[in-house]
């Protein structure tokens, strides 16, 4: 059955599909796969900054080529990973195998066993998802909220001189101005934006039980 607004699993992808389309780049399955690729790549690059003998000869000039794997991530790449998953029956492992194939293509096969080294799947997932939320907030959600605040402030100035009936305890009370009441909402939203900016985007990294066990066994000299 083809996806349409009537058989989508929720109104987010159904009735409101046209309104939520900008969020597909962050919350679709393809987006999640891309973020997993990004985490794996950046983790490998981070490993190269440590005194690991097997990675000392890795050319740092290749970091740009590695980052292009997620910066230029395509629907075809996502499909290739889904095809691998048909064999692995494991979504994160499919990403790992995809990257190993890409390392082969780039001529750096000697280093591919350090992809996903010492990690568990949730290290990747619990970093990819918070990063996607952070990017969505900064790229789409917050700018839209800012537009709403600007519109409210414009309306507040436009209607600042218009008197209106006000109430307290459900009874008629001293009058107010329409512009002032609109400004109340813009101020409330700005306060919430300040709180939104302070929300931490925590991630989880540490191996199967969070103790970096595999890392410590393999390289006990590295803290």
PLM ranges: what are they?
Residues 2-215, 219-223:
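A helix-coil-helix interface module used to build multimeric assemblies
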């Amino acid at each position: 059955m083809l996806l349409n607004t009537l058989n989508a699993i929720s109104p987010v992808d159904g009735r409101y599909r046209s309104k939520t389309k900008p969020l597909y780049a962050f919350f679709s399955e393809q987006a999640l796969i891309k973020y997993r690729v990004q985490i794996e790549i950046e983790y490998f690059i981070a490993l190269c900054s440590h005194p690991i003998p097997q990675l000392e000869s890795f050319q740092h000039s290749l970091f740009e080529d590695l980052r292009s794997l997620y910066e230029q991530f395509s629907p075809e790449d996502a499909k290739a990973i889904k095809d691998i998953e048909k064999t692995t029956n494991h979504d994160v492992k499919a990403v790992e195998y995809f990257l190993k194939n890409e390392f082969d293509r780039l001529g750096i096969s000697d280093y591919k066993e350090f992809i996903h080294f010492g990690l568990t799947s949730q290290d990747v997932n619990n970093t990819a998802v918070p990063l996607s939320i952070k990017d969505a907030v900064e790229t789409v959600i917050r700018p839209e909220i800012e537009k709403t605040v600007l519109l409210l402030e414009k309306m507040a100035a436009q209607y600042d001189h218009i008197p209106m009936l006000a109430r307290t305890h459900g009874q008629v009370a001293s009058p107010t101005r329409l512009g002032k009441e609109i400004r109340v909402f813009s101020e409330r939203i700005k306060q919430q934006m300040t709180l939104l900016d302070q929300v931490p985007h925590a991630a989880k990294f540490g191996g199967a039980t969070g103790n970096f066990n595999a890392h410590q066994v393999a390289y006990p000299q590295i803290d």
